[in-house]
Structure formats: C-alpha cells, structure tokens
C-alpha cells in the first residue's frame, strides 16, 4: 500500500514539476521494482504456508490461485486502459483507489483473524 501511495505522489510530482526524462523513469520504475521484488518473495512463501495441509493438490491449487491473480491483474489493466487520459492524474487516482481498497481488505481480514483467534480455546 505504501508503494502505491509513493507511486501516486510521484505521479503528481511528475505532472506538476518539469523533471528530466531520466528522473521521471526512476520515479516510476523504482517503486515498481521494489513492489515486484516484494511480490516475488511474498507469494511463494504465502502459498506454501497456505497449502501445506493440501500437499496432494498443491500444484492444482497453486495454478488456480495464479489464474485468479492474473484475472485480477487483467481487470486492473483493463480499468487503466479505460481511464487513460492526457495526464497521469487518472493513473494516480487509480493507485489511490487501489490503496484504499487494499487497506479495507486488510482491515476486514484482520477482524476475521482476530475473531477466529479469540474463538480458539487455550
């Protein structure tokens, strides 16, 4: 979520302040590279933990999760193509909306986790 906010701030900076071409590329690519490194480290660890009780179907379940992931990515990419405009403000707004939806999702999952944890007897 922080990287989406950083990306949105960078987008507004690029729109308001005239910057060099190399700085603009760095301001866009740096947060994306950090995100991809985190994503490539996090997803395999998360899936291995989530699927440890389902060792017989780990490959199938992993491919289903991968398919769902790519459907979500395709939907976001489609949304980006529909709100495309002459400025980068629309994309920054999309990053902000995705950050808010991520925060709401995290909060809902956290509440469910706390309820589940409180129902487990010690």
UniProtKB/Swiss-Prot annotation:
InterPro entries: MFS_trans_sf. This is Putative uncharacterized protein RC0923.
């Amino acid at each position: 979520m922080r990287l989406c906010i950083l990306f949105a701030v960078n987008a507004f900076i690029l729109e308001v302040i005239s910057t060099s071409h190399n700085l603009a590329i760095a301001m866009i690519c740096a947060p994306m590279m950090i995100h991809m490194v985190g994503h490539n480290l996090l997803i395999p660890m998360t899936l291995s933990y989530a699927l440890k009780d389902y060792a017989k179907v780990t490959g199938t379940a992993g491919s289903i999760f991968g398919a769902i992931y790519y459907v979500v990515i395709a939907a976001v990419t489609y949304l980006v193509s529909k709100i495309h405009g002459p400025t980068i403000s629309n994309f920054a707004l999309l990053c902000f909306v995705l950050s808010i939806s991520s925060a709401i999702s995290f909060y809902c999952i956290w509440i469910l986790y706390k309820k589940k944890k409180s129902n487990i007897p010690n």
